[in-house]
């Protein structure tokens, strides 16, 4: 369900659709994922980077795990990096993974030796050397699934996430009752919220699959 949301945001910004696949490489689309370096959420954002991009991190809410907020931050970051690397998306993705400092240093070293400064020519950490090809390989498999003998699930728009505005804080159990969804599913779709109250210290919205959105809006409006 996250992929639909991210694809919509990437499309709005006219960015390459391959970027939608990065959370697969980063976290397998797990908003609860946390790395050894304390990177969190589907985009695996570290605390300091999160703060630099306005991602609130408190005892009751971590925007790095919020699909909406973290996607906005990740795409903002990549747009900034892309300008820095003159529109080269492979260098942009490499810098997203290892930091722009490392990529710039590797480019400077290659320039000094009279070597090319494209992604494939740079001396980068092993993780980054694998990271970019993984994204490209996933993209190739999706585009040529029949050739690879891969059966892809049929896209189901009703599973896409929708944002439902909250005028007041609401208990997650109440939203579960209104939608017929489980609390655990709601917590996964709204992973930034650490407690059981939505719309309190976190964002003034709740994310639910499209098929439940209208029903929830009506239930909330009727009190």
Regions picked out by a protein language model, each given a short descriptive name:
Residues 1-2, 8, 12-13, 52, ...:
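Extracytoplasmic and endomembrane cell-envelope/extracellular-matrix remodeling and assembly machinery
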Residues 16-24, 40, 88-94:
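Alpha-helical scaffolds flanking conserved acidic
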Residues 33-54:
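Short, surface-exposed glycine/acidic/tryptophan-bearing loops
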């Amino acid at each position: 369900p996250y992929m639909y949301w991210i694809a919509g945001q990437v499309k709005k910004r006219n960015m390459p659709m391959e970027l939608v696949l990065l959370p697969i490489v980063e976290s397998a689309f797990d908003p609860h994922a946390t790395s050894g370096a304390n990177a969190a959420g589907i985009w695996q954002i570290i605390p300091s980077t999160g703060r630099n991009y306005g991602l609130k991190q408190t005892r009751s809410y971590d925007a790095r795990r919020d699909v909406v907020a973290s996607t906005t931050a990740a795409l903002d970051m990549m747009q900034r990096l892309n300008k820095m690397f003159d529109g080269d998306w492979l260098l942009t993705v490499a810098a997203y993974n290892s930091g722009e400092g490392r990529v710039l240093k590797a480019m400077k070293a290659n320039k000094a030796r009279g070597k090319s400064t494209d992604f494939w020519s740079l001396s980068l950490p092993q993780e980054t050397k694998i990271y970019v090809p993984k994204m490209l390989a996933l993209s190739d498999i999706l585009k040529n699934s029949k050739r690879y003998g891969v059966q892809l699930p049929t896209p189901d728009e009703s599973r896409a996430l929708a944002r439902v505005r909250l005028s007041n804080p609401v208990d997650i159990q109440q939203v579960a009752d209104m939608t017929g969804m489980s609390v655990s599913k709601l917590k996964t779709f709204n992973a930034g919220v650490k407690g059981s109250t939505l719309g309190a210290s976190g964002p003034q919205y709740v994310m639910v699959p499209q098929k439940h959105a209208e029903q929830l809006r009506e239930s909330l409006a009727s009190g």
